[in-house]
Amino acid sequence: ESATYRATVQVTQVSNQEENVVTIIKGEGDSAMDALNAVTLFNGKKPLYSHSLILVLGRSCAEEGLSHVMDFFIRYPESHPTVNILMADHLAEEILSTKQEDGKYMQARDIAELAKGGRYNGETVQTETLDVINQLRGEGSSPYLPIVRQEGEAVVSSGTAVFSGDQL
């Protein structure tokens, strides 16, 4: 039986050098909590999710329904309600594991700028955790998420996903 949830976490390793190094840690589990616990078991350190900048959901997660995942992130004590949420055109792991021309991972803050840019050019939306929770619980409203995809050595915006209830 394969794991239902996969978590891919970008971790910034602070150093004395001019630029901090970003690494990727992955975990799998039967729930979002199990997958995130597997990340913790990988390196023995508890990630500081309160510092999270983005949450990227894979297409399959969006198709299955947002309620369980969003419920976890709104109830998890270290999760922040203003984290930008994006949907990957395919796998979230591909987005967070995108390597740039210099061989370094594209950083979460740069990916977050894609959603924020939509405020200025109207090509996409910016959605935070609390927005999605309110849209899921509000009568007559449906969640929407910016869609991103990997394009070579970059992550680009590719539209907006509109949900029916909690499913894509």
List the model feature ranges, each with a label.
Residues 1-168:
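A glycine-rich, acidic short-motif signal
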